[in-house]
Curated annotation (Swiss-Prot):
Domain of life the protein comes from: Bacteria
Family: Belongs to the bacterial solute-binding protein 7 family.
UniProt entry tagged with the keyword Transport: yes
Species of the source: Acinetobacter baumannii
Protein name per Swiss-Prot or TrEMBL: Probable solute-binding protein AdeT1
Keyword Transmembrane assigned: no
Its job: Mediates antimicrobial resistance via active efflux. Contributes to resistance to antibiotics such as chloramphenicol, erythromycin and novobiocin. May be part of a tripartite ATP-independent periplasmic (TRAP) transport system.
Gene transcribed to yield this protein: adeT1
One GO process term, biological-process aspect: response to antibiotic
InterPro entries linked to this entry: AdeT1/2, TRAP_DctP_sf
Disruption phenotype: Deletion of the gene results in increased susceptibility to different antibiotics, dyes, detergents and disinfectants.
Keywords tagged on the record: Antibiotic resistance, Transport
Amino acid sequence: MFDPIGKSGDAFALAKDYALEAKNWGADLSLKAYVDERVAAEDLKVGKCDGAIISGLRGRQFNKYTGSLDAVGALTNMKTAINAYKLLSSPMAAKNMVVGPYEIAGLGTIGPAYLFVNDRSINTLAKAAGKKIGVFKYDEAQPKLVQHVGGQAVSVDVTNAGAKFNNHEIDIVPAPIVAFKPFELYKGLGEKGAIVRFPLTQISADFIIRKDQFPAGFGQKSRTWVASQLNRTFGIIAKYESDIPSKYWMDIPKNEQLNYMKMMREARIQLTKAGIYDPKMMNFLKKVRCKENPSNFECALNDE
């Protein structure tokens, strides 16, 4: 499983609890921590592992439907994310969890993705124009988003994103708050930088298994248990956020938040048309958002 901190991380601790539960479902799991999720995904593909816990961005190659959960702006708050994950973990959604030999056996969370900027004057989308923005090369959506705001996309991966930000090779990097300490992002923030307190999305954690290597019914039992742990994992993430010194956080004005939402919505629609995001998932997530907040401007529109 992927944990940037390795065996001592909170994600690996959760995986150990998961392995204990899995014995009740007829599976004896042996855990291995990966600090590079690309290697974890490759080991799953070639059969070195029977399962892997990786981010939804990396998991999109195994299941486009669940891999579209992380679509930009689709889930920007914890309550909506928990509702969506729990609905998708119910038996009614089981048919969408299997693609070829792979089954999504759980939908967890790595937490919200925030923009880390090296200068807090970058407080509007317009001011991101011309800036060097780190994009994860395996996610086709990110370069298109950067193009949308007029920035320069710079390819990064989990192993070097922090170093590139800290060495000022990039001005902006999107990252979950759990990356703050292990990737030493405070170095890149310095005295002038900030974390924009406006989540771009929630980064999901996909529990992916080779279905034929597990007992019948394992996938649903697993999804139900993972969903039952969502409040726990979001609590861990909230603690990470509260531990960040207040000087690093930057709030953006309400009118600028609306600009962000509109830009991300336009980008989602374009990326869905381009075949990157799954249209069924986009429709489902819109329904979840509008049930939560029926007065939102998007709820009167029907193009997503």
